[in-house]
Amino acid sequence: MSKDTASQPSLTKLIGLDIFGVGRLHAILLICIFLSAIGVVLATHNTRQMTVQRENLLLEKDILDGEWRNLILEESALAEHSRVQARSVRELDMERPAPDKEVIIKLR
């Protein structure tokens, strides 16, 4: 009996020979399938992260647009001619010069 077991290869050797010998194509295809599945998972994860980042940026853009509109309104209110003129008279004692005191300078 010892002669029979010595002449027969072990089960692990047979499995190894089967996978790397006869089933080499199947092993390569299995590795390719696993790599492809990992690639799909990574691509899906990156897409979800970028979608969340895009939504956050759109929310920030909306907030900044509202702030911009408020600043434009404030600027137009502060730059209104009658307000500037009234403040210059009140705070700086400025007044419009009489037409006879105006001097016109001609440039070449």
UniProtKB/Swiss-Prot annotation:
Keywords: Cell cycle, Cell division, Cell inner membrane, Cell membrane, Membrane, Transmembrane, Transmembrane helix. The chain crosses the membrane at residues 25-45. The keyword NADP does not apply. It is a single-pass type II membrane protein. Residues 1-24 are cytoplasmic. The keyword Cell inner membrane applies. It is found in: Cell inner membrane. One of its GO terms (biological process) is FtsZ-dependent cytokinesis. Residues 46-108 are periplasmic. One of its GO terms (cellular component) is cell division site. Essential cell division protein. May link together the upstream cell division proteins, which are predominantly cytoplasmic, with the downstream cell division proteins, which are predominantly periplasmic. Belongs to the FtsL family. HAMAP family: FtsL (MF_00910). Part of a complex composed of FtsB, FtsL and FtsQ. This is Cell division protein FtsL. It comes from Aliivibrio fischeri (strain ATCC 700601 / ES114) (Vibrio fischeri). The lineage of its organism: Bacteria, Pseudomonadati, Pseudomonadota, Gammaproteobacteria, Vibrionales.
